[in-house]
Amino acid sequence: MNKTPMTTRGAEKLREELNHLKTVARPRVIEAIAEARAHGDLKENAEYQAAREQQGFIEGRIKEIEAKLANAQIIDVTRLNPGGKVVFGATAEIEDLASGEVVTYQIVGEDEAEIKEGRISVTSPIARALIGKQEGDVATVQAPGGTREYEIVSVRYV
């Protein structure tokens, strides 16, 4: 099975969520189930049914996170030395040659992507066009809205 690239930051966020689910959410829902059981007939007990449903969601999410972490290739961006090239984990400042707009993106794993925070998926059209390029290069992006060209202004590994 292929490993999925993930930054150390992304892995840490998943570990924090996993810890919260195991130490806070799971015990809380187990307590809610026990409390609802005490109310009697389980067939018509909405509290019990809701708590069991929540438990199923929590257990499913725990398994999902554990699988993601087990299948992750965690990459420490600060230790990269790709010689100025855009690679997974790099932060690239790019200029749209048509509009002159300058934006900064970090290329991250699919689960870490958050466009509003400047993190784009390694599988996105922009990231695919940028990877392997370096400062001064022009990347051509085939996007749903048409072809766009971006000049790479700077590349950082933070």
Swiss-Prot record:
Q: Name one GO molecular function term.
A: DNA binding
List the residue ranges forming a coiled coil, or say none.
Answer: 49-73
Which Pfam families would you find in this protein's record? GreA_GreB (PF01272), GreA_GreB_N (PF03449)
Q: Which domain of life is it from?
A: Bacteria
* Record keywords: Coiled coil, DNA-binding, Transcription, Transcription regulation
Q: Which GO terms describe its biological process?
A: DNA-templated transcription elongation; regulation of DNA-templated transcription elongation
Against PROSITE patterns, the record matches this protein to: GREAB_1, GREAB_2
- Family indicated by similarity: Belongs to the GreA/GreB family.
Q: Which HAMAP family match?
A: GreA_GreB
Q: What does this protein do?
A: Necessary for efficient RNA polymerase transcription elongation past template-encoded arresting sites. The arresting sites in DNA have the property of trapping a certain fraction of elongating RNA polymerases that pass through, resulting in locked ternary complexes. Cleavage of the nascent transcript by cleavage factors such as GreA or GreB allows the resumption of elongation from the new 3'terminus. GreA releases sequences of 2 to 3 nucleotides.
Spell out the protein name for this chain: Transcription elongation factor GreA
State the species of origin.
Methylococcus capsulatus (strain ATCC 33009 / NCIMB 11132 / Bath)
